[in-house]
Amino acid sequence: MGIAKIPAVLWLLACAVLTFAVAISPAHGGRTRRHYDFFITETNYRRLCHEKSVLTVNGQFPGPTIYARKGDLVIVNVYNHGNKNITIHWHGVDQPRNPWSDGPEFITQCPIRPDGKFTYQVIMSEEEGTLWWHAHSDFDRATVLGAIVVHPKHGDTFPFKRPDKEIPIILGEWWKNDVNHLLEEMKRIGEDVKPSDANTINGQPGDMFPCSRDDTFKVAVEHGNTYLLQVINAGLTNDMFFAVSGHRLTVVGIDARYTKPLTVEYIMIAPGQTMDLLLEANRSLGSKSNSRYYMAARTFITLPVPIPFNNSTATAVVEYYTGDSGAGPPDFPAVLPSLDDVDAAMAFLRQLRSLGSKDHPVHVPTHVDEHMLIDLAINFLPCNATNATDTACKGPKGNTTRFAASLNNVSFVSPAIDVLHAYYYGSGRGVYEDDFPNNPAPVFVNLTGDNDRPGVTKHGAKVKVLEYGTVVEVVFQDTSFESHPMHLHGFAFYVVGLGSGKFDDRRDPATYNLLDPPYQSTVSVPKAGWAAIRFRADNPGVWFMHCHFDRHMVWGMNTVFIVKDGKTPQAQMLPRPPNMPKC
């Protein structure tokens, strides 16, 4: 019987069974195996008084949560019953020696075609905490996404008070239009993508949006209990501030790496990032006290010009068990920063520190082998830069240009076959060039104003090749009018420095934190500022690095690190699986 003939209710029930009845195999090579089946399908969802068909996994939006323990092997069978090509990325999972299952389209694999199947082997290593998975093709991750929760190994414990309950909180965005139609229009006319119609918390916009109040996500809490909020910013275009009215939040992890406990009124979380937050349900339940509190997510935006942006805030409701059916409206978090509060964002980011305990030590490299300064730029190219007959261009600067983006003056263009395939078989010629520059071309950049760099870019698939074990320091220098969440596949890195203005290589390294810097896989590079990261290139393979604002990735703010094999078998990339999708 074809899947299309199964009644919708039975289909969703079957998917739910497959999602939650996860097979756990005996340990293999010291790893416990966990098995999941993901079915990509078109599913109708109604939001903001409007129904549309979206791609989902197992009919769910957000998709199913993957549960694992540190060091497990998670095997995910992906069946593409949708109407377009797709890939899945396991965001923040290092995947030691296994780029074959990392997921970015045309970087480590060709996409899974409609009616096709691919089995991902997701190798957990040092991660503990919250990560996530998402589509890594076009704008599909708007709805094809879900949480990954990695618990400590059996016998180990959290390095903080054990929570009474864990609650995944996925922050996202919703468009009334088809997101991939918006993507195609953006590419066709060279303009920015239309802003989303709503922010969401676990797929719901909340009480402040039309036709949404009945479905607002609710969290039931009991006085005296502790809750672990596993917060993920899955948005395509927006940094977000997040807070819970009447409650402080204690940050205990970021990107599945533990932090020193940091108690705050709010957080700022960039797209791609995850944070583990402890919430103490400690509010008084007296006769005059409210028992309902808003959990709120508001966009943080640094763009200098007015845009048609709906800055209403997504909300969920934290409700105390009181037995009072007549509880009043929830309180709103007055501490939530305003839409453009750069100081609030920087104040939060500067406080993050790695835990640095005996069981979770810090190993910041003190000697650097390879220094890289990478300019992050938004560019404007002539409308006919890539097509001499371009007549549809309606981009900025009086409809004479189209948007582009670059790293060190190079706008990355994905090849027709994946980079990993070409590298593995020694056939990179004509697929990629291995001369990504360590420094930007000398161009004057005014960081005191709202800068852009018209025309200072070229298209290409340039990659950076690293010897195994090389210690790399990358300084990201923002030269544009907004911040950039930079994500590196295959590695976590230490964020050793963060600052405003132009990086000074004589002065700023003296300000680095080499004692307990946060250990992340996505860093928010401040507008007209810089961020310095360090990592050891000890994971052989092909690894994508890109801005996690998806429109910037489409415009070319990407590159690839190729890490060569080391000398021992355990320092060499795993063999190519036999079932890789074909281009």
UniProtKB/Swiss-Prot annotation:
The keyword Transferase does not apply. InterPro entries: Cu-oxidase-like_N, Cu-oxidase_2nd, Cu-oxidase_C, Cu-oxidase_fam, Cu_oxidase_CS, Cu_oxidase_Cu_BS, Cupredoxin, CuRO_1_LCC. One of its GO terms (biological process) is lignin catabolic process. Cu cation 2 binds at residues 91, 134, 548. It holds the Pfam family Cu-oxidase_2. Residues 39-155, 165-323, 436-567 form the Plastocyanin-like domain. Cu cation 3 binds at residues 136, 489, 546. Transmembrane segments: none annotated. Its cofactor is Cu cation. It is found in: Secreted, Extracellular space, Apoplast. Its EC number is 1.10.3.2. Binds 4 Cu cations per monomer. One of its GO terms (molecular function) is copper ion binding. Cu cation 1 binds at residues 89, 487. It catalyses: 4 hydroquinone + O2 = 4 benzosemiquinone + 2 H2O. Cu cation 4 binds at residues 484, 547, 552, 557. Lignin degradation and detoxification of lignin-derived products. This is Laccase-21.
